[in-house]
Amino acid sequence: MDAQLTFKKYLDFSQFPRNWRVCRAAVDWQGSPLLLVDEGKPPYPSGDASTEARIRWFNTLPRARHLVYWDGTSQTTLTLDKSAGIGSFQVQRFGEGWLLGGGRGGRTDVCDNKGRLQRTLDLGDSGNDVQTTSDGHIWVSYSDEEVFGGGVGQHGVVCFDSAGRAIFKYSEFADQNQLPRIDDCYAMNVVNAEEVWLSYYSDFPLVSIKNFQLNRAWKNFGCMNPAFAILGETVISQKCYTRVEGKSQLLRRSISASAQTEPAHAIDEKGVVIDGLFTAIAKGPNFYVLTDTALYELQRNR
């Protein structure tokens, strides 16, 4: 019998206006979720839509973009400055404000706590993921398009300081530690200012980095995409390549014996399976799943 992981509904999207749609989710350094929400963008084209229709949709900007975030149990909605954030699909806390990035051309916007643009950084073109730390470090992971396209993305994962200067390049680190280089970084977990974990294509090792030094590495640990949580000696992740018949899946794996892998069902507090497609987001031990209708948080004590 498959394992069960219990999730609590964190936010029901029915509380949003009808023309609001969650376009991106992340986790901040406090372990709380961050949601980028589009206002007024048309629904995504149907499954039989043409490529041209999908491109038009992708290039259609929303009327406004909002950031929903939490401080403790207090929920806040912030409308972002139209000169920043509209074309972004990454969000993180940054100092007293916000970092909005991931768009084409490498532009990353630094905004104050009111969502007003203050300055821009160039962190490379279209990173897979961006995660920040409370001391101002910016970790960016890159896809194969950037890895093989030249530029800073060729290093697979890069850590930048608060001014946008590269202070750690994974390709150099991998060579120094006899690790495979990154072809495409599928998942990254920046636990805190000292600790970072990576899972990447094509060998799919699990690599633990502490203070920019190799802590531990497991060869051929297995694919995890797009996120994983570290709970002691256990890893919780979304299973790769398994969107079979419209159903996402989770895995629970032991770090101490990586061969011990078991499928896990996501259930709510009433024991009902969270069915259909969902997307995982994580940071440290904090793990959430995002469906079309709600955001759920893993209950770690159950």
Language model features by range: what are they?
Residues L36-T60, W139-H155, T242:
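Short, conserved, GDST-rich strand-edge loop motifs in beta-rich repeat architectures
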Residues T279-R302:
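Blade-level signature of beta-propeller repeat domains, shared across WD40, Kelch, NHL, RCC1
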Residues P17-Q30, P43-Y44, D81-G95, L123-D135, ...:
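Repeated scaffold domains used in trafficking and secretory/extracellular systems
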Residues T51-D71, V110-D112, V152-R165, S248-S258:
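Beta-propeller blade signature
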Residues K9-F16, T73-K82, G115-D122, A166-L179, ...:
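A short beta-strand motif characteristic of beta-propeller blades
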Residues S46-E96:
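Blade-loop segments of beta-propeller domains
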Residues L34, W98-L99, I138-W139, V196-L198, ...:
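Conserved beta-propeller blade signature
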Residues D184, S199, W218-E262:
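Loop/turn-rich, solvent-exposed surfaces of beta-rich toroidal or solenoidal domains
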